[in-house]
């Protein structure tokens, strides 16, 4: 068992600050900021089974978590824009954490004394109203990650596999927004029908108060309203948990014993087959791999838009020794 806890501050980061376009430049580079990194790493490995019959099983688990807190940026700057995708921003706010996802949300009852506190406000047409202010809808960083490797051996045969756990964090899916807005997502059909419905947990404003909403809407009108915020739809709805558990790779091999190779010129022969990106055991983003992010030239990994799916690969190996 190995465990390590760390805490460090990275200062004078290279930042791009926006400038007045009339200056002739879009931004300027400065050295500023103070980001505090705090985390924990644990590694546990051992032999679980090693019997005289030749069967052995060894296992290794590696756990990690990390928090990047923004202590300060630059005088007069309280929020650094890592990347903006239309109405969605991935930012680093002072007092918050690196990679927070900001965007618009449903308009809700904010009076804590109201019996309808927290409910979505709709218009007279029964469709939800959208807030004009941006607020936090998630963070791209996982709460914790773990890799679990297992290795089994028996009389020349070997089987090993790695399971990856990425728990927590969020990702905005513009792909899901496009599918729902156009009625191509399974969620736009309930029990094989697109019947009118009353948006659940909603109220309509009446004078200085609110009343339960009873106005039914069509699925088409509802999803078009949700998709009308910018080009990518309402961030609150299309920000999903990025939690996923996957069988990352598996390898099966066989090594011939030397007795079998006595009449050959080989000292060693091993055959093996490997498959990578084998099986998505659990995920929350419908039909999309959370690792399929929209951009590769930025640290903003909490956004995807029609990205190509991650590939599955197969490898066959023959290893010989003379």
Specify the residue positions occupied by each region the protein language model found.
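Glycine-rich, aromatic-lined ligand/substrate-binding cores of catalytic
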Residues: 137-174
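Short hydrophobic/aromatic-rich motifs at helix boundaries and adjacent loops
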Residues: 12-16, 118-120, 220-228
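Conserved small-residue
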Residues: 30, 40, 49-140, 171, ...
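Conserved SET/PR-domain catalytic core that frames the SAM/AdoMet-binding pocket
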Residues: 60, 132, 142-156, 248-253, ...
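Extracellular/periplasmic, surface-exposed regions of secreted and cell-surface proteins
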Residues: 1-94, 230, 234-322
């Amino acid at each position: 068992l190995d465990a390590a806890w760390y805490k460090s501050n990275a200062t004078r980061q290279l930042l791009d600050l926006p400038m007045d376009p009339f200056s002739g430049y879009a931004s300027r580079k400065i050295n500023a900021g103070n980001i505090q990194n705090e985390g924990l790493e644990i590694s546990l490995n051992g032999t679980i089974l090693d019997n005289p019959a030749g069967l052995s099983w060894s296992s290794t688990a590696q756990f990690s978590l990390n928090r990047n807190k923004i202590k300060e940026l630059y005088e007069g700057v309280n929020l650094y824009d890592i990347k903006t995708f239309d109405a969605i921003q991935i930012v680093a706010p002072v007092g918050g954490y690196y990679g927070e996802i900001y965007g618009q949300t449903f308009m809700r009852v904010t009076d804590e004394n109201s019996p309808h506190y927290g409910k979505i406000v709709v218009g007279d047409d029964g469709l939800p109203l959208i807030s004009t202010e941006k607020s936090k809808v998630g963070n791209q960083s996982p709460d914790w990650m773990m890799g679990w490797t297992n290795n089994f051996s028996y009389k020349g045969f070997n089987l090993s596999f790695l399971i990856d756990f990425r728990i927590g964090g969020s990702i905005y899916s513009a792909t899901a927004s496009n599918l729902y807005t156009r009625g191509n997502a399974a969620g736009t059909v309930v029990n094989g029908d697109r019947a009118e419905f009353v948006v659940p947990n909603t109220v309509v404003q009446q004078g200085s108060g609110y009343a339960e909403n009873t106005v039914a809407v069509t699925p088409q009108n509802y999803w078009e309203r949700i998709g009308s915020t910018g080009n990518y739809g309402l961030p609150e709805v299309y920000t999903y948990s990025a939690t996923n558990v996957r069988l990352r790779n598996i390898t099966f091999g066989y090594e011939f014993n030397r007795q079998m190779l006595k009449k050959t010129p080989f000292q060693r022969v091993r055959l093996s087959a490997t498959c990578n990106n084998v099986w998505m055991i659990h995920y929350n983003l419908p039909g999309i791999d959370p690792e399929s992010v929209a951009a590769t030239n930025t640290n903003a990994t909490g956004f995807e838009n029609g990205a190509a799916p991650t590939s599955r690969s197969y490898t066959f190996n023959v290893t010989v020794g003379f």
